[in-house]
Amino acid sequence: MERAVRESHLDSFVSDGSSLHEWVYGMVRTELGMNPNQETDKGNIILTDDLKYLREVMKNFGSVAKDYAKETYESFVHLPIEFPLAPDGHRPVSELFRKRSNDLLLITLDELKIPYHIVGGTIEERLQKISEIYQLKPVMSIEQAVSLAKKEAQNYNIVQEGK
């Protein structure tokens, strides 16, 4: 909801996620549990009554999120899963969670007929491809941008994926 409010005040924007991402994560959590981990990947999943109820809530949220996405987003850049999860203990997800989320997002984008570009490769390659797709004028080199981002990430104790 907060995302939609912020986006509504802008003429145009680039975002690192969407209402669809939030809905997808919620739906997959109702399937795999609130804290999917390696045990989840082995098939050890216990779905409580609370999760079953949450699934119904998420289905309803999904119709709103889908309508909003269809009206708001011109296109998506989809970054496929190419890097392993960082073993930092901060991400309450598993490889199975990532795969299911990835698949549901792509199915939903197709269902809604929202155009998307699948952009893979190293961080630098991804940035180059995205800049070309959207004809973005660089204000610094990609190498400089990545270097600055990595330095900033260190300030937040963020484990850097895709090195």
Label each PLM-derived region with a short phrase:
Residues 30-121, 138, 144-148:
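A glycine- and Lys/Arg-enriched "phosphate-lid" helix/loop adjacent to the NTP-binding pocket
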Residues 124-140:
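Two-component system phosphotransfer/interaction surface
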Residues 1-9, 28, 81, 134-138, ...:
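Generic secondary-structure transition motif, activating predominantly at the C-termini of alpha-helices
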Residues 19-22, 82-84, 123-124:
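Short, solvent-exposed loop/turn segments at secondary-structure junctions
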Residues 142-163:
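PAPS-dependent sulfotransferase catalytic core
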Residues 15-19, 122, 141:
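Secondary-structure junction/capping motif
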Residues 1-40:
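Conserved nucleotide-sensing/catalytic segment adjacent to the nucleotide-binding pocket
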